[in-house]
Regions:
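Structured alpha-helical
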Residues: 1-109
């Protein structure tokens, strides 16, 4: 049986790393399944509604990136990066203070 044509403009690489979605009033663990330069596919523990804009933390890399939710299907979501990744190590700008605190609570450094 033929596989459906992949219409992505960029190739995705497998990641399988722990992530954390942070929005005002929400910290949601997730798995970063795969990623490209412009987007990330996430797997969530629960089927919760997400706001359009999120802050996605890569726990292993201790980085955060602003993103927009592009699609949702069950417990998976695709997000489009809307900014560059910022380090959460050391001093961080005030806009990332909540993300740094969430990273520490999740066991990141």
């Amino acid at each position: 049986m033929d596989r459906p044509e992949d219409r992505r403009l960029e190739t995705r690489s497998s990641a399988n790393v722990r992530g954390l979605i942070v929005t005002p009033g929400l910290e949601l663990p997730c798995l970063i399944v795969d990623q490209s330069n412009s987007g990330v596919r996430l797997r969530l523990d629960r089927n919760l509604a997400l706001p359009n804009r999120i802050l996605l933390i890569d726990i292993a890399q201790a980085t955060a990136v602003e993103a927009e939710v592009a699609w949702r299907k069950g417990q998976e979501a695709g997000v489009k990066r809307t900014g560059a990744a910022s380090s959460l190590r050391g001093l961080v700008p005030s806009r990332l203070a909540a993300a740094r605190a969430a990273l520490i609570r999740a066991g990141g450094r």
